[in-house]
A protein has these predicted regions:
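Structural micro-motif
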Residues: 43-63, 147-164
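Long, charged amphipathic helices and adjacent flexible linkers at domain junctions
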Residues: 87-102, 193-195
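Short active-site neighborhood of thiol/selenol oxidoreductases, capturing the structured segment around
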Residues: 7-12, 104-114
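Thiol-based oxidoreductase modules, predominantly thioredoxin-like and allied folds used
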Residues: 14, 34-45, 134-148
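Non-catalytic, surface beta->alpha helical segment in thiol-disulfide oxidoreductase systems
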Residues: 55-87, 162-197
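Typically the conserved alpha-helix immediately C-terminal to a functionally engaged Cys/Sec
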Residues: 19-30, 120-132
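The canonical Cys-X-X-Cys-His
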Residues: 116-119, 161
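Short, small-residue-biased leader/transition segments that mark boundaries at the very start
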Residues: 1-6
Length: 197
């Protein structure tokens, strides 16, 4: 069952009430699932509270959730754990090949609300890619708790995807559509890095 594939979690807190909510949420989840261990970290982390998904050896998987992964994002969170633990959700060979071929460092920030029904598809797709490719990070944010980020990226609706802190895209995407976007982004950065002559 799913209980056999849970991995470790690390959570970062501050003094806000949402941090206390995250702490009790994660501790309760760990009580219900013996294969899941959580540890609180005080090392500097941006945009707290957050939960990082760690591999069984304690290394960072590139997956994180900023806020409390409840509401519609509970499923995304569980699928993230499942995909990091391996073998994860089944993918066809072509999709797996496309994921493995991504070689540029890519940072995906996915802004969501817990009541959004279209957000989980994008979060699951992004985190599935990150779980399989160490060059990719996928961090979801409950936008209600991060108004400064909402303003920085002028987020008008969710889901909202920010690539490498620059490119802002709105709307849900399947894993195939997201790979199209990431491949175009890589192609564009390769072209712009090429010396003129």
């Amino acid at each position: 069952g799913l209980g056999d594939v849970y991995k470790r979690q690390e959570f970062y807190l501050d003094e806000k009430a949402i941090s206390e909510e995250l702490r009790s949420y994660m501790e309760e989840l760990a009580r219900l699932t013996p294969k899941l261990t959580v540890r609180k970290s005080t090392e500097g982390a941006e945009h707290v509270p957050l939960v990082r998904v760690l591999r069984s050896d304690g290394s960072d998987s590139g997956l994180a959730f900023h806020g409390v992964p409840g509401g519609h994002e509970f499923t995304s969170f569980i699928m993230g754990l499942y995909n990091v633990a391996g073998p994860g959700q089944a993918l066809d060979g072509e999709t797996m090949g496309r994921i493995k071929a991504l070689d540029a460092p890519t940072d995906m920030q996915i802004f969501v609300s817990l009541s959004c029904t279209m957000c989980p598809e994008l979060v699951i797709a992004a985190q599935h890619i990150a779980a399989l490719n160490p060059n990719v990070r996928a961090e979801a944010y409950d936008l209600n708790h991060f108004p400064a980020l909402k303003e920085t990226y002028n987020v008008m609706s969710v889901p909202c995807l920010v690539l490498n802190g620059e490119k802002v895209l709105f709307g849900k995407k399947s894993i195939s559509q997201l790979l199209d976007t990431l491949e175009q982004q890589e192609q564009k950065s390769r072209t712009s890095d090429r010396p003129e002559g």
